[in-house]
Amino acid sequence: MTSRTDETANATALGYEQARDELIEVVRRLEAGGTTLEESLALWERGEELAKVCRTWLEGARKRLDAALAEEENAGDDSE
């Protein structure tokens, strides 16, 4: 059995697509029902970790896009 810290570390090592796909599977399992309360709580906790990973990836992508757009605007201003 893995510790909670190990699971969190594993989640943060995932790429966006991997985390998103696993999150989709977690949601599917929760919506399907048929799990014990303990299993449901574990799935919910994993889902929260995965959602955080996805959010971090998306925020990083947004920052990179904003930086690239700002750089492009600055380059355009310098050429005038």
Swiss-Prot record:
Its EC number is 3.1.11.6. One of its GO terms (molecular function) is exodeoxyribonuclease VII activity. GO terms for cellular component: cytosol; exodeoxyribonuclease VII complex. InterPro entries: Exonuc_VII_S, Exonuc_VII_ssu_sf. The keyword tRNA-binding does not apply. It comes from the Bacteria. It is found in: Cytoplasm. GO terms for biological process: DNA catabolic process. Keywords: Cytoplasm, Exonuclease, Hydrolase, Nuclease. Belongs to the XseB family. Heterooligomer composed of large and small subunits. Bidirectionally degrades single-stranded DNA into large acid-insoluble oligonucleotides, which are then degraded further into small acid-soluble oligonucleotides. This is Exodeoxyribonuclease 7 small subunit. It comes from Streptomyces avermitilis (strain ATCC 31267 / DSM 46492 / JCM 5070 / NBRC 14893 / NCIMB 12804 / NRRL 8165 / MA-4680). The lineage of its organism: Bacteria, Bacillati, Actinomycetota, Actinomycetes, Kitasatosporales.
